[in-house]
Amino acid sequence: MPPIRGLYFFRSSSRLRAVRALGLDVGSKTIGIALTDEAGIAAHPLTVLERAGNSGDATTIAAMVAQNGVTDVVVGMPYELSGKVGHRGRQVQQFIKVLAAAIAPLEIHEQDERFTTAEAERVLIEADVSRAKRKAVIDQQAAALILQTWLDAYRKRTESR
């Protein structure tokens, strides 16, 4: 489906809607954050948030959601290699519950994040980013990969309807 007036529209149920999504790579110390462009086609690294507890983080992210006109939030789920939800995954699920209350009625989508940090590191190395700079931006780059993966799959599902 072609862009219309700078926005990419996705079919949702029986209606079309524009998508502006925020992607999160939730870690124990930081949260990498990415945002789609206004057309809803490409994900871009945005920032890294130092963790301030689930409630504080949810409040900060809710403000970003409002400020950027976000319609969907995508959270990377750290599944184990077996596909099961482990300790880290349960921590992320707890965060999702707190975030969901802060951004209601927006929907939160979970996206498998296995290997995204390794892929983000590979991308940054190929771009000849220094080790010190990589450390500062790896989480937001991983968030962008998580978000782009979800966006591509969502577009494909939507266009095939």
Each language-model region and where it sits:
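Phosphate- and other anionic-substrate recognition elements at nucleic-acid/protein interfaces
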Residues: 2-22, 28-161
